[in-house]
A protein has these predicted regions:
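Short, flexible loop segments at boundaries between secondary-structure elements
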Residues: 125-145
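Residue-level signal for well-ordered alpha-helical scaffold segments within enzymatic catalytic domains
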Residues: 90-93, 111, 115, 139, ...
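Short, Lys/Arg-enriched N-terminal segments with co-localized hydrophobic residues
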Residues: 1-2
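Acidic, Mg2+-coordinating catalytic module of metal-dependent nucleases/exonucleases
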Residues: 100-106, 111-112, 144-176
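Substrate-recognition/cap helix-loop segment adjacent to the acidic, metal-dependent catalytic center
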Residues: 92-95, 107-128
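Conserved non-catalytic scaffold segment of RNase H-like nuclease domains
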Residues: 5, 10-103
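Anionic group-transfer/hydrolysis microenvironments
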Residues: 10-12, 26, 105-106, 111, ...
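Short, function-defining helix-loop hinge/capping sites that tune catalysis or transport
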Residues: 16-18, 141, 166
Length: 176
């Protein structure tokens, strides 16, 4: 079986040059309902990114100000932030053996990661043809009115939720 991974970023901008706040990831098998596992989650040092000219948008700061306190505190708090080099090492190590890389809108998460990898002079740990978009898949089925959602905008919880939803839709569409 191929290994699928879901990645999600929380950022301070919607541009490819965005400052990254947090990175989340889970590995999963879309062909069954086994719990997503091998979670990856960390917070990235903001000052080193702004020093490199990475983007912060006022609209995004304003948006963060509207989020529940526990969500914005987790994303914006100062504790336990890792360097950009450490971020790249962590993502690269976690990505070993992954065949398919999912996210909700590749022009966001993977565009930002690709941009920062290039800025730091590193190749990305995926090929363009390995990228999948959960948003496209989700648009193929009617929205579930009973869908319960917690922890939105926590990068790890978003990944878990999106991976579970991919599994559910593969089953619904009888994708084998």
């Amino acid at each position: 079986r191929m290994i699928h991974a879901m990645i999600d970023l929380e950022t301070l901008s919607t541009n490819p040059e965005a400052v990254i706040l947090t990175v989340g990831g889970v590995k999963f098998d879309p062909y069954n309902t086994i719990e997503p596992s091998q979670g990856m989650y960390f917070r990235v040092d903001v000052d080193s990114q702004t020093a490199k000219g990475r983007d912060v948008m006022q609209d995004t700061l304003d948006w963060w100000a509207t989020q529940p306190k526990e969500i914005s505190d987790e994303a914006l708090g100062d504790k336990d932030r890792i360097s950009l080099e450490e971020m790249i090492k962590t993502i690269n190590k976690w990505s070993v053996g992954v065949d398919v890389f999912w996210c909700q809108g590749p022009l966001f998460d993977y565009a930002i990661l690709q941009n920062i990898y290039k800025q730091l002079g590193h190749p990305v740990p995926w090929q363009y043809w390995q990228i999948r978009d959960s948003r496209t898949l989700f648009s193929l089925v009617p929205k579930d009115p009973n869908e319960q959602r917690t922890g939105m905008h926590n990068a790890l919880e978003d990944c878990y939720f999106q991976a579970k939803k991919v599994q559910k839709i593969y089953k619904q569409l009888n994708i084998k």
